[in-house]
């Protein structure tokens, strides 16, 4: 869009605004699909953080909030229809201008560069744009930070970078002094990262990508003196010489304010969340009723890491694919601690006709090769190291880890970053205080500014959380000593039950697990020990290695998992169920009730958050959900899509009914 056209569009609106409320804008282009044509809509992200949803109706953008964003539509013939898009970007508190431009699919960052040409009165700055290029490093010699935005068009490449906790450019590993920020944005098939390279003469090394998989936009953050941007591009140096006129300041995040957050629980949920929050600069205090981390459901010797996939592209799949890939890197990032693990892969086979049909449905979908691949019987035998003689689905990046040791490692790592831990603290109740929450314990009271409950199966023991729609499931895991051909097993087997390779630290395997609803006892049960053995015999009948499964020593461990109705975890603000019921009684259900709940936020307990319901796949999902919850508490965009985050909302069970006008049970 030319400067003259832009001025014609902006001036009539700018002239009506008081100067103090004209906000500096930074524009991201989101493609809208209308029929067979793609359009792009730039939206703004100034300083004030406000999450919600934008509805586009007849040329006006209205966030569902107390703030209003004015929308100027220069092409009403293209956008007369109603549209909506999820929004987790900051919105301004005062009036602002949004340009809405319709173009026939140019490269995404050409749009972004064009959007920067807003007002020629701003200082001239340099920018560089590289499309479909293999970039190995970026370095700058400017005196002020450099903003780097990377568009990754291949999901596997995205996961290789964005989900790698050890990679210097990962949003989860921004400890290097010269790299700051780090947010991941995702819409449809486009994913991109945004971060800052802060210190001059410092280089940021990128992974080598296929040239068709990445676009990079590099531009100054603020005013630069003698900006010089250099990209190492396929062995040659490219100097960015395009000079669009850009605003003098492009804030895309609100100023960071450290928060004082208390966590109750030291299992996978609490330990990983503590680490995620500390990495973002918050003050974290952890309380646990047990004497050490990982005593509850997270206390098993070995636990399998593999995704919970479905044939549909539903919330479970969209959660577990990235969560599974990140879990591996999370574990590996703690490998310098005493931590038994082995990413030897997970082989899933059918144990009956129904299970086999389900695996076939899973394999009918195309998965990234890093996630899941089909294997035949011969390949399965080679992968397992023992006779399987049936095909299935193989998760090459799966494996096992000691959950108890993982919790210990995460806590020890968090202590190096300032975590304050208090064990043997039994919290009997919590009450709202003037500046947060008061925790009532067996020895006295503790004040907390903000509170996250990650207490496993005890989550429903408090008055504020007793109505959460979670159910406890007892699970007993059998310990099997290594004998005979069991030593040859090279991968985790998963069928009617699961069986792990030998753990060198204990000299045994884990086999399990029972699944008893509503039972919170952790006592040993011989019946469940026999059931675990029978499941493995049923899964691999007649195989000689199964004969070496010995449970005669009666060694096992039982834990209690918390599971939701839809098998999705819960992470987010704690719902105020009493207030929801009060509003429901006043409004009723039906069309009137549906309309109300579609436009009003459900009540929550201020400053109180839930992290629970990880079920039997907490090792696979917990670390990434912790990252997303930490992002939400930090006022930054979570890695997961907005609708997936909504699906994790502890309020979801009630809201699904209320938004449809259905009666509550």
From Swiss-Prot:
Got a GO cellular component term for this one? cytoplasm
Q: Which GO terms describe its molecular function?
A: flavin adenine dinucleotide binding; oxidoreductase activity, acting on the CH-NH group of donors; tRNA (5-methylaminomethyl-2-thiouridylate)(34)-methyltransferase activity
Membrane-spanning ranges: none
- Subcellular localization(s) per the UniProt record: Cytoplasm
Q: Where is this region: FAD-dependent cmnm(5)s(2)U34 oxidoreductase?
A: 264-665
> Could you tell me the superkingdom of the organism this chain comes from?
Bacteria
Function field:
Catalyzes the last two steps in the biosynthesis of 5-methylaminomethyl-2-thiouridine (mnm(5)s(2)U) at the wobble position (U34) in tRNA. Catalyzes the FAD-dependent demodification of cmnm(5)s(2)U34 to nm(5)s(2)U34, followed by the transfer of a methyl group from S-adenosyl-L-methionine to nm(5)s(2)U34, to form mnm(5)s(2)U34.
Q: What protein name is recorded for this chain?
A: tRNA 5-methylaminomethyl-2-thiouridine biosynthesis bifunctional protein MnmC
Protein source organism = Shewanella amazonensis (strain ATCC BAA-1098 / SB2B)
